[in-house]
From Swiss-Prot:
Compositionally skewed regions (Acidic residues) per UniProt: 105-121
Key words, A-Z: Coiled coil
Keyword set includes Cell membrane: no
Basic and acidic residues biased stretches: 16-44, 145-154, 162-208
Keyword Coiled coil part of the UniProt annotation: yes
Stretches the record annotates as Disordered: 1-133, 145-208
The protein's name in its UniProt record: 28 kDa heat- and acid-stable phosphoprotein homolog
InterPro entries reported in the protein's UniProt record: Casein_kinase_sb_PP28, HAP28
Record's compositionally biased regions (Low complexity): 52-69, 84-100
Pfam families per the UniProt record, alphabetical: PP28
Amino acid sequence: MAGGKRGGKVAPTKTFGRDYERSKGKISRDRVYDEEDIIKRNQESDSDDNSGSESGSENETKNNNNKSKLGSDSSDDEPVIVSRNPNAKKPAAKRPPTTKKQQESDSEDDSDKESDSEDEIANPNRMKQVTKKLSEINVNAKVELSRREKEELARQAATQRQNEKQQKSDLERLQVIRKQREEAAKRKEEEKKANEEKMAERRRLGLA
């Protein structure tokens, strides 16, 4: 048969490059290992794990040492103070910003205080009286009275004089009344005596 396929086995073709490496990897994966190969592989993996764990433990110990050093340094540099006093003062709260109205009211209060102090200086009567000890008071010193005190004393003296005059006039009037009563009593007695004498004369004349 001309032009037909050839019967029988096909000759293997050679592979190069990437195809060769892939085919080689497949062959190595499909390979069956003996017991000795398995034991060697296990020993190698155990040694790798041990070395990894030792390196990990060394790294952990180093990290812990570094942390402890950092903690000791921070504790030495910045000591933490815990106050157990319940009455400890708290930090003062921030004051709110003052507005224009508050500033104006504060300025008005200051001006009022200044005016009050000026009035006290100008008017000595408004000054606060200073308490003095008995030993500091001079009894013999003349006391200067104010105008109001002088007016009050003059008014009291005038009322006292008026009362004295009224009492005098009352006494004089009482004396006059007493004299009038005494004179009236004398007249009554005289009239009574005169009447009695007349009655006595009539009796004598009648009997005669």
